[in-house]
Amino acid sequence: MPLVTRNIEPRHLCRQTLPSDTSELECRTNITLANVIRQLGSLSKYAEDIFGEICTQASAFASRVNSLAERVDRVQVKVTQLDPKEEEVSLQGINTRKAFRSSTTQDQKLFDRNSLPVPVLETYNSCDAPPPLNNLSPYRDDGKEALKFYTNPSYFFDLWKEKMLQDTKDIMKEKRKHRKEKKDNPNRGNVNPRKIKTRKEEWEKMKMGQEFVESKERLGPSGYSSTLVYQNGSIGSVENVDAASYPPPPQSDSASSPSPSFSEDNLPPPPAEFSYPADNQRGSVLAGPKRTSMVSPSHPPPAPPLSSPPGPKPGFAPPPAPPPPPPMSVPPPLPSMGFGSPGTPPPPSPPSFPPHPDFAAPPPPPPPPAADYPMPPPPLSQPSGGAPPPPPPPPPPGPPPLPFSGADGQPAAPPPPPPSEATKPKSSLPAVSDARSDLLSAIRQGFQLRRVEEQREQEKRDVVGNDVATILSRRIAVEYSDSEDDSSEFDEDDWSD
């Protein structure tokens, strides 16, 4: 329906009740003339309102134009008549002045109570007033106004504001979640794209001939055979594994008893300092996930000739010689190429050097003794007569050895356990359980304490930016902002209680 801003009265000029004692024509004429005069009075009143508003706007516009003209004149004088050679502007004077910043007022609240036109306000005041339900507001427990249940002009604005604030909160939660995922996965943005597979490399290999393709396929990325394996710092090939590819046994050994191969779980790791010499004849047999036997179960390895000392392979330097073994109270066992029982893994023992003087690299750690020699006791059961030999340092640092007691060889008693609750002296004071301890436990468990001044906090939020322009500008700033820091203005606890 159209909104009537100005109503000219009376609407009907001739609709009047005529008296019965006078002439009808004369009465009708007089009544019509009087109503016409009244309508002209209404028109003159509305014309005064219209032209008065136009005059007010014109005067405000004229004042703005005059102010702008004065500023333009001052700027023109400074631009045209200022001589930079005579008048020097100090740097301090420039820094003390504030930069120009225009303050643009946004047009909003177009349909507010204060922006109502005068005729519309008069029409509104002529209507019946709502019942005085606000007198019941002090008796409500929820603190809401009773009149808002009858009529609430700000209902739609409050509904829209709640929706906008909820959307802003959801956007901030999503951005905070993405930032957290980005911090947890720093390499997420640096994902390498998958390489496109083409047959160009294959045709490049086949360009020189089929025999070169096979030789290139055998070699690894560094030019060595693809079957090269590494063990204890040495390089060897599985294809060259034979009886002559292992170091010779010591000269004092007369026989060696073969034993079945061990699995990876029962085989102890060799020390890191002792490695195989990097020559052409020695290698490792670790070609798969499981270790294989170092010797054949039926044939002992023959000793290589000592007339020609092994020369180091070019490109690989032999490892340094280990220090001499410390004195031991227990005579060292004579090593052999056989293994002991699978259930008793041997401890690492000091290395034995070959009698040849030209042999610079140390041999690999000897295997456990055969059944012909007595089994040496483990390091944990050595008597205290002699200091236990320091084991060679493995790659990961192991736990320190247990302390030993006297000559009985038993480990020293562990430190006494802490006194139990039964042995602790009971305090005469009872356990303190008051509101402070409960408060501390609640804070530690992460519970959010209920705010005491919820109403004041809500009033503060309503005062700051409770209009359409501020809410929309905040929403746009949140959506298009790329800052990494979380603003306290959009914190979760600030908008939801």
Curated annotation (Swiss-Prot):
Q: Where in the sequence is Phosphoserine found?
A: 473
Pro residues composition bias: residue spans: 298-335, 343-403
Its localization reads:
Cytoplasm, Cytoskeleton; Cell projection, Lamellipodium; Basolateral cell membrane
- Give coiled-coil spans as residue ranges: none
Which residues does the annotated region (Disordered) include?
173-203, 239-436
Q: Output the InterPro entries linked to this UniProt entry.
A: SCAR/WAVE_fam, WH2_dom
Alphabetized, the UniProt keywords read: Actin-binding, Cell membrane, Cell projection, Cytoplasm, Cytoskeleton, Membrane, Phosphoprotein
Domain text: Binds and activates the Arp2/3 complex via the C-terminal domain. Interacts with actin via the WH2 domain.
Query: What name goes with this protein?
Result: Actin-binding protein WASF2
Q: Which gene encodes it?
A: Wasf2
